[in-house]
Amino acid sequence: MVRGVPPEKQKGLLPDAWFDAWWEAALRPDPAGVGQTPPVVRAPNGIIEDLRKYWMSGKPHYDPANIAVPTLLILAEWDADAPPYMAQAIFANLKNTPAKRMVMIGEGTHSVVMEKNRLQLFREVQLFLEEPK
């Protein structure tokens, strides 16, 4: 069960072969994680501290108004970890960027980079990087 995804849409969202390839690549650089049974992907604690200090307390980690470069926000329709309203709030506060764009990837979650619509994500990033600023 993938949080936030309608039950009828869950099958096929994340292709097995793609996840398997990611899992192998994620384990490779960490011999300590690979050596555990079962193997684990270890992550630094900093993200947990940031969650407690900023997200859970409602304090922003940074001020979007301080961003002064072209900015692309990409969000996924079913992202339960960083729901669309969060990106919309950031977008509204990008007051000093010379250009801003927000794109929603349909039928995607926080793991959209591994999901069936990942090519749309890649395409949007490529277009943004290649366009004249």
Task: Please report, for each region that a protein language model flagged, where it lies by residue.
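Conserved alpha/beta-hydrolase "acid-adjacent" motif
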Residues: A80-M86
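Short, conserved loop/helix-junction motifs that constitute active-site signature segments
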Residues: P64-I67, N93-T97
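Short, highly selective alpha-helical patches that border small-molecule cofactor pockets
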Residues: A87-F91
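C-terminal alpha-helix
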Residues: E124-P132
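Alpha/beta-hydrolase
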Residues: M1-V69
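Catalytic histidine-centered segment of alpha/beta-hydrolase-like enzymes
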Residues: M102, G108-F122
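Short beta-strand/loop motif that positions the catalytic acidic residue
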Residues: I67, L73-L75, D79
